[in-house]
């Protein structure tokens, strides 16, 4: 039996926090039901946030921005919202695929790092070339978060037992003229584990 995969467009890594959460949930629901249909209060539950008027307003505004930028299709019938991914995802050249089980492990992990930032950084690390040294700052620039957030997310990812997948992280150091060493960055490689 083939495991289900989720597809994320690389350009989603640059969108705002709420927009990424909504695109992720739309991806999950598109996989299961082809679209999300329900009230904003129910959407709060799917995203994992408190159902409050401020959060519903943020979701509503995010839905409009995503629809205006052709990330999603949005149909509103009174207070029922139907959200599905736009066809533009199918045309995207840079799709990152992950196992649905990996998403669930990241989402269900209770840690200081938010699930959406951890997922974004996971997706970035999957796409990095194995031979290129990169810093937390570089990754933070890609996804629009602070260096400390990247550090927390990488620490979280190292703790997750993916069972069939491991991140190998190596420090890249250079020797200075005075004989001391300085860290240049880290290289990330991924290994699939077969049983």
Task: Please place each PLM-identified region on the residue numbering.
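Electropositive, intrinsically flexible nucleic-acid-contacting patches
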Residues: 1-195
């Amino acid at each position: 039996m083939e495991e289900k995969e989720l597809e994320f467009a690389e350009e989603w890594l640059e969108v705002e926090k709420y927009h990424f959460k909504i695109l992720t949930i739309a991806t999950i629901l598109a996989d299961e039901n082809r679209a999300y249909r329900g009230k904003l209060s129910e959407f709060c539950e799917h995203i994992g946030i408190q159902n409050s008027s401020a959060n519903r307003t943020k979701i509503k505004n995010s839905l409009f921005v995503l629809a205006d930028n052709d990330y999603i299709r949005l149909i509103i019938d009174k207070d029922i919202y139907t959200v599905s991914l736009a066809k533009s995802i199918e045309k995207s050249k840079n799709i990152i695929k992950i196992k649905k089980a990996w998403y669930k492990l990241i989402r269900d992990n209770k840690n200081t790092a938010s699930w959406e930032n951890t997922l974004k950084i996971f997706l970035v690390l999957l796409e990095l070339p194995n031979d290129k040294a990169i810093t937390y700052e570089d990754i933070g620039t890609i996804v629009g978060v602070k260096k400390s957030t990247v550090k927390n997310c990488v620490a979280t990812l190292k703790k997750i037992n993916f069972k069939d997948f491991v991140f190998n992280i190596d420090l890249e150091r250079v020797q200075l003229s005075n004989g001391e060493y300085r860290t240049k960055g880290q290289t990330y490689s991924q290994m699939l584990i077969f049983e």
